[in-house]
UniProtKB/Swiss-Prot annotation:
Pfam families cross-referenced by the UniProt entry: PD40 (PF07676), TolB_N (PF04052)
Protein name, per record: Tol-Pal system protein TolB
Species assigned in the record: Burkholderia vietnamiensis (strain G4 / LMG 22486)
Function noted in UniProt: Part of the Tol-Pal system, which plays a role in outer membrane invagination during cell division and is important for maintaining outer membrane integrity.
GO biological process: cell division; protein import
Residue ranges, annotated region (Disordered): 411-431
Protein's cellular compartments: Periplasm
Keyword field: Cell cycle, Cell division, Periplasm, Signal
Main location (coarse class): periplasm
Amino acid sequence: MSLMTKLGFRALVASCLIAAGGAANAQVNVLITGVGSTQFPIATANFANEAGLPQQVTSIVRADLARSGKFTNIDAGSTPVPETASVDLGAWKAKGANAFVAGSVNREANGQYKVNFILYDTVKQQSLGGLSLTANDTTLRTAGHKIADYIYQKLLGVRGVFATRLSYVIKTGNRYQLQISDSDGQNARIALSSTEPIISPAWSPSGTKVAYVSFERKKPIVYIHDLPTGRRYMVSDQKGNNSAPAWSPDGNTLAVALSLTGNTQIYTVNANGGGLRRLTQSSSIDTEPFYSPDGHWIYFTSDRGGAPQIYRMPAQGESAGAAQRVTFTGSYNTSPRVSPDGKLLAYISRTGGGFKLYVQDLQTGAANAITNTNRDESPSFAANGQYILYATQSGGRNVLAAVPTDGSAPPQILSVQGGSVREPSWGPFMQ
């Protein structure tokens, strides 16, 4: 299999483009297939005044915590418990819960909701605080995700990612859709719909834009989609292939792979489409750039050594320092992604005839496969570095999967009924 084929420079098919901003009919569903070896027992009581609301905040919180693989939900019964109630923490500890959550959702005169909750440590018999959130019918889900994030951080010491978003491409029949959803696959919206392939979505650091590659003009072109306005604009339409956009940490620049002069090389372009600059100067294929979180390095895939491996160079390009090989486990490694703390490298390695997700410690060089799947591609770290989202195959279908970065639990499968889903990208923390 050639590097160009593996990296997804697909053959073109026919037809027209439809830009869209509506709700998605084909929606990703989450299947929880395993949990971590150590789980935190927590009881979340039904929030008061939830009956009849368009979204049940309590259910969203419980589902988020279960989906993380880090918590086990202790049965809290059916009786609502508001945050103002007097709580017998000893009784909840006796039921096996090391933490307890109480809350309420109250409709205000302006039609909005006030969502209040409090988190208790039943072991230390103390309050861990809470939040008071304002929401409307469409943002009640977000309120639930924010509550789960608060719980995750208070109890585990790591910022939660339930209120982040995903982007991915769903293919149903001959139609491709770039969708944006909550981290649980719900609340999906269509950013772009086309009968031409859409690949390589990449979130801006602000979480307000997604860069991607569309084949709608019979060749791959890089676009940026502004999510708040729904507008999009072309960033790179150079001669040949325009592919693999990756944002700089400051959001001002995109690294891209262009075949402008023949072999694909790494360039940078300003986010407004100007200032094109070549970074690599090899006679090989250099592609799939990705910035380190400090902005000092660009990691990329190259076959300059005879087979695809991952290299890194100064962000200013090879003129500022020679590229150095990073991966040495296996003979075929692609798709570099650096963790938010800059300590880990996720990539795809050809292993035993399949392709598996590996994680490498960038300080020691130690690398390990962390999945039990064999057709892995397109890894993307969660904003807290605790999970990796990737595309794979399960039951003969193209699906997404999320796995802890340390491989401590089996992947959770995200699939779509009647279609396939690929090209995942996990968004940053919400501003």
